[in-house]
UniProtKB/Swiss-Prot annotation:
InterPro entries: Hint_dom_sf, Intein_N, PolC_DP2, PolC_DP2_cat_dom, PolC_DP2_central_dom, PolC_DP2_N. This is DNA polymerase II large subunit. It catalyses: DNA(n) + a 2'-deoxyribonucleoside 5'-triphosphate = DNA(n+1) + diphosphate; Exonucleolytic cleavage in the 3'- to 5'-direction to yield nucleoside 5'-phosphates. GO terms for biological process: DNA catabolic process; DNA-templated DNA replication; intein-mediated protein splicing. GO terms for molecular function: DNA binding; DNA-directed DNA polymerase activity; single-stranded DNA 3'-5' DNA exonuclease activity. The keyword Transmembrane does not apply. Keywords: Autocatalytic cleavage, DNA replication, DNA-binding, DNA-directed DNA polymerase, Exonuclease, Hydrolase, Multifunctional enzyme, Nuclease, Nucleotidyltransferase, Protein splicing, Transferase. Residues 283-312 have a biased composition (Acidic residues). Residues 279-320, 657-704 are annotated as: Disordered.
Amino acid sequence: MREADEQYFETLETQLEAAFDVAERAKERGGDPKPEVEIPTARDMADRVENILGIDGVAERVRELEGQMSREEAALELVEDFVEGTVGDYDSREGKVEGAVRTAVALLTEGVVAAPIEGIDRVELLENDDGTEFINVYYAGPIRSAGGTAQALSVLVADYARALLGIDQYKAREEEIGRYAEEIDLYDKDTGLQYSPKEKETKFIAEHMPIMLDGEATGDEEVSGYRDLERVDSNSPRGGMCLVLAEGIALKAPKIQRYTRNLDEVDWPWLQDLIDGTIGKDEADEGDSAEDANGDDAGEGADDDGGDEADEQAGPPRVEPADKYLRDLIAGRPVFSHPSKSGGFRLRYGRSRNHGFATAGVHPATMHLVDDFLATGTQIKTERPGKAAGVVPVDTIEGPTVRLANGDVRRIDDAEEALAVRNGVEKILDLGEYLVNYGEFVENNHPLAPASYTVEWWEQDLAAAGADVQAMQDSPHIDLADPSAEEAIEWATEYDAPLHPKYTYLWHDVSIEQVCALADAVEDAQVAQADGAYADPEMDGTAGDAHSDDGALVLPRSDAVQQTLEHLLIGHTQDEETITVTDWVPLVRTLGFSRSLERDWTREDLSEHARTYGESESLDAIGVAEDAEREDGQNAIKAINEVAPFQVRERAPTRIGNRMGRPEKSERRDLSPAVHTLSPIGEAGGAQRDVAKATKHADDMSDTPGQVEVEVARRRCPDCGTETHQANCAECSGTTEPVYVCPDCEAEVERDESGRAECGRCETLASPTQYKVLDLQEAYRDALQNVGERETAFEQLKAVKGLTSEEKVPEPMEKGILRAKHDVSAFKDGTVRYDMTDLPVTAVRASELDVSAERLRGLGYTEDIHGDPLTHEDQLVELKVQDIVLSDGAAEHMLQTARFVDDLLEQYYGLERFYEFDDREDLVGELVFGMAPHTSAATVGRVVGFTSAAVGYAHPYFHAAKRRNCFHPDTRLWYEDENDDWEYGTIEELVESRLDDPQEDDFGTLVQELDGDLTVSSLGENGPCRQPVDAVSKHPAPDHLVEVAVGDRTLRVTPDHTMLRAGPDGIEEVPASDLAAGDDLPAYDGGETTTMTARGEASTAATDGAAPTDTVEAVEYVESDVDHVYCLTVADTHRVAVEGTYVGQCDGDEDCVMLLMDGLLNFSKSYLPNQRGGQMDAPLVMSSRIDPSEIDDEAHNMDIMDAYPREFYEATREMKDPTEVEDVMKIAEETLGTDREYTEFRHTHDTANIAAGPDLSAYKTLGSMEDKMDAQLEISRKLRAVVESDVAERIIEYHFLPDLIGNLRAFSRQEVRCLDCGESFRRAPLTGDCRECGGRVNLTVHEGSVNKYIDTAIRVADEFGARDYTKQRLKILERKIESVFENDHNKQSGIADFM
């Protein structure tokens, strides 16, 4: 590590230690669950392992061993330390084995939380039939997240510890061996295994395994043959055991054997038989394997041979257009380009400094000219190389080319100019360049697409042709990026090099016919000087000089010539009779003309190959011909190269289609609804959870106001014996401890070494909670007094209804009072958080961060990226790996949080204020926690500046992980399969049948991306719709699920699963754990399918009229009975209809940040929900240093070059695999483990401001959905690359029609509801009165919600030229709606009706 990097990390750690000292002093004084900071610091992986497991001495020993051996070897070496007692404090033998096994798994998973803590339940000592003892390791489902190698090694570690402790081997009984085989087979059928061993293999392993593999029962199925065994607790498959035996031992036998051979105490000779295939494999299997291997080789060879045929093709090499991103278009989110269509974004290779993975560089002028729908951080669905990307502004690429209302055509390379002219833009002829880095193609395993011919490629071609490019770059008189026309032509002819890209027009976008028509027009053209006189180009040496004002080419105007110039992207002006091109010499020379406008060729002189080149390009990806009469000769590049006196390259051979996805995000993260304190008040606070209201609540007149019964902790002070529910003793201020009581016999139970509290008499788990009546009036009054505040200090104090943590320790209400005062809310762990769309940046300028160069120097930025001293704000400096840039909104929120923290320290803890910020500049240099939600680990970051964009910028290594929320396997849903058939089945069947080649992450999640042919019913902003499924996934199941009862059906999901709840302001998204009885959920009535799913008894109208609602009858936590849960990734809406209810599904979490001192003071594990997954999103450990070798491989694939080599560009012309050019490219992976791993992140493109372009997408600023849709269609009209009728068709087909049909069906099947008592009836009472209370009943679905889009749909179909079939469908539907709502009895008739 460089000295500068070490100094940087030491600076962060010094600040961290100072904050820790203050927080520790505060914790000793307050009423927190623990008297110390609960977020341990980990400088490296060894620290994380120790902190996660809580075993003293592990980190130091791991560091000693890491330098001497591999992690696997270190895990085995640590076994001796546990057995000898030098590491860990275990009295029992089984405790030592358990400590060794957990540490091994933690070490091999680099500190990932789930596997070592939740994947190993316990270790027991049991007896063989001969009286000897053996080790039984009890695995749980989350061991899946450790991966096969760690699973298998955990067994080897247990065996090694057994041998060192002198414990005998496990001697399996015959029935147990048979049980293992039956159980593995049943588990594989029920849940699925990556590798399913043969029956002989399983029995062989079970017979020789020296450790008994056991585990928790999962699933509803039971074995049929080997039941009720003495040493097996359940008749159901044990998921953890099955995973370890099948995916660990059976699959990873070769790896395990490497380590068994080095251990004298352990001998597993039977592994060799397993590896040799003499057990459980037959010749047919081997033949298949050999065939597969040969097939792979043959495929590679075929690929190698195919590259030389490109020149013989009828057209140039092109990637196939792909329209998957267009499927199920969302109303209000524009299409920017149809697939690979001319006029769309032009692919340019490179990486800007604000560019990384899943990002796309777009010119800020383009962002403004598409009516601000694109902003920094806006997600776009894209044709390639990936499926989606976040937009980042890059102004060093080419901007869009537009035609103005007066007919002028110009390229806009300045955002200010774009704003000035956008009201006068008639057509966007070209969207400009689209910057994608090489690593994106590597990550997505996408063949390289032909590159645009750019300056960086041309310079290398010029050098290869013999020019001294370095001398030319050093010359003050030469600008290689922007040469004059005369210079460009001179270089091209002198060096026999391709023409400069500036003067290389898009000849591949025009046909031979168009070129010939343009040539004819040039032949008839004249050159006009500035004074209007026509000049003889041969006589006037200055005419046509791009840098003079005395020459312009005047062409006779015709539609064909105008269209050709527009497609070539040649700037020009025009009047009724002429078209004027100012920079004309390169054009006429490329067309084979002399300066005197003479040529020596005709169409007949062109070769047959040139005249027919590109015949395959007449149709685009959606089958729409741009020019129906064109049949061949679509690409004029061959013809141009035959007539031009120099080489001309294809300027932009690859166009990339895309459309808008999700808008950018920068907002506070609240629980739903937002609360200020994690103190329980039951139902007394009403829907708003209002504490003041709860203090006055009484169930009836005889009750004392404010007396509320809630479930809280049962605790006792160890000093004075006082029993309480608080973390602090009110009598002596000591820290109380939990008291576990058996629910059956009410005896107190002590926890064992593993933390379990099981009653020895009843064999029941004891509980640390109790139901207790709290006096909220007294608690509220005391809390206000303790912090010296009055009720007037805040508008409302909101609390939670109940606690979801294991011990149910309430948070001090004083903290909530101060949060309410400063308008910040508490997350589930007690912290205050802010979410931001995460974007990468590797170099920044002080000027764009709203800080001074002096301030940056104070943070250690002493020199710029070129090594020059940092003296002014415009210098570019390399961003340090843990420095982050906050959005303006985040900065304001941090200021509020800092004021809350200062008040907390002063008024509650009695210490000095810590921050004392006056304005946001004071935030610069302060530490924050950055949370990557899935990892349960916080990374310390430092604020270096601010951006007006609604995103958070950080180094690519300071990256985000994604969380997925899942369904129980038996969850049923409607889906339209790949054959366009509607099916109704379980999500498990849907997912498992499509896991063909899934990717596995560090947490055991299997993800299979789909091509969009699978469609589900969804709920968009304007009602029901159908959406494609982008991916399916399978995840390790949590210990508990949330079961939601709705009518006669139940829905089981993970506790953090996003649910949709109907509220007064429309549909809101909330975690499943936040639902309560009485909540209304949007109901699915079958959509466009022929069968309606079951509906509940209670139904009310959705607030937005888009769907009816069902009422939740009960919500409860239930133990998970499965080993895996499943989910879908639904495009755009991220919502899906399951079990008759619309719910949320997989959605990537943005990175969230929290102020350091807030996390240190207020985070507590005691507040976390008591369920598997409850510890996700929680900073269980914090990393003070990012280790590049430990982060996601995605970041390692990012290229870090300042220029791409010529070999790379040439390879793109052959569409080679990205791995074929890896030898000439440099990616971040190459610097791992060197002293350059934190530096030298070079980029190929700069940009003036990382926040350029609109601050917010127009999607967020426009009002109604109809306004958004009108803007969407208006953009379609302006964009040359968009077929507006196709956009209109898709909106109607995927939004309006499903909405109208669904709402009409809902109207016919609706329930009625009493306006007085709220009772619902499936059929309206004949009297019209409520049968319960006599009140008036009313419809729940009204006419307005049924026909609200019919007029709009018909208007769009007529205005934008939808197909007759679509118009007819709408007319038929309009008649159906009229027939439902028209009163036939009162219909007015004319005399003609009777004639």
